[in-house]
Amino acid sequence: MMRNLKTFRALALATLLATTASAGSAGAVDISLLRFFGECNTEYGTVTDISKANGECGIITVLTNKFNAENTLGAKVVTQTVEWGAYYDQLTATYSTGNIPDVAVMHASVMPNFSGRDLLTPLSGPLKELGIPSDDFVPAALKNATANGEIYALPFDLHALLFHVNMDLMKQANMANPDGSPMLPKSADELIAQGKKFKEATGKPFIASESQSAEGMMVRFFDTLMWQQGVDVVSADGKAASIDTPEGLNAAKLISAIYSEGLANPALDYPGSEQAFLNGEAGILLNGTWGVDNYDSQAKSGKAALKSYRVANVPQLFANQKVWADSHMWVIPKDENRSAEKTKAAEAFLKFLYDNNYEWSRTGHLSVRQSVLDSAAFKALPHRNEFAATATNATALPQVQNQRAVYNAMITDLNAMWLTGTEPQAALSAMQAGVERVLRRNR
């Protein structure tokens, strides 16, 4: 595995040097990078050894440092970090202020809002010139980055919802299989039954999840349950919603019961849900692939109450094995005033990120490169075999505009079931009406 890993990193460095050397005419130039993933310069501000980085913030920070230290263009990436919730409003505002970033991170679910308004630089040609083969991208990732036959983004990952599991607590509740894996439910009724059994045995909530209307973690779970029943929340043309349906009521009743039966703490925000899990206060954390590296490191450190950590695909509770997913991608926002030198440097940075996609996959995200997924180094990463099926089960809303607005419209009304006692049917009706208002923009 170490030989394979060293080969990955050597190839990445060699390609960086070759790429930047061939673009040497660009000269020394600063380029701006707008991103979320947090700020961690105190820990990683001067680190260039990627093997010492962990987590999303650590890995992207060190990758940026490494590019700045090693590229032969003399290019320097200057990073501006934005809090996740405000990110897309701030990115949109840059088109009015003129401070358009040279590179920006973007979710696949948001890209249609920008590509549909001609706000992104087409990348099919540049990626080909940089030697990035489109056939190395897994189909779902390439689809996410494409609109009307043109590639507008460099895919960076597929990320999805997972069950993060405290196996010590599961064993305490007699909910561990002989092979050491967690005993997970196979139906909605079984999930509630297991949750009650777990709570009785441990005195703790079965599930920890962000529940305070900021992240909308349960909206992702609701979408998952809808897809598992064969229903798309939004139609393929982005003009109709299918929320207030029998399938929607099944999903809403299950989520409502998780809270009404005391199987989850409704007071937890996102950091609180993670802390509860790390403190050994819940059996399962409902969160994404992005947490795997962090939780594994914390469990191994001996400093957290969480000691025995495992990962599981979100279980199939209905007819189909599906799970909510999205992608992080990198774009070059369109700017008619950007110099050729800045464009070359931005493209070189994208090539560097592509070459180091394995490093990003250490976060827990699934690589978008088939060559990385097939590698021994990737397969040897902690827990990857435990959620391998997620790559196949990953499902997203159609590539239509206003996906993020649909998501936001659902959060408040769904969360009202446990925050204000709204009945599931009333929550469904409100979600349907709210999403329909958003989708009128697509007509």
Task: Give the ranges of each region predicted by the language model.
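Conserved N-terminal structural module of periplasmic/extracytoplasmic solute-binding proteins
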Residues: 24-113, 135, 318, 426, ...
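Extracytoplasmic/periplasmic solute-binding protein
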Residues: 29-32, 148-156, 161, 188-240, ...
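Hinge/lid segment of periplasmic solute-binding proteins
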Residues: 108-162, 190-194, 218-221, 306-312
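Short, solvent-exposed loop/beta-turn-alpha elements that line the ligand-binding surface or hinge
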Residues: 124-137, 180-184, 206-214, 229-250, ...
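Periplasmic-binding protein-like
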Residues: 171, 202, 350-372
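Glycine-centered hinge/linker elements that transmit conformational signals in sensory
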Residues: 190-197, 236-267
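Long, aromatic- and glycine/proline-rich binding clefts that accommodate carbohydrate-like moieties
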Residues: 309-314, 361-416, 441-442
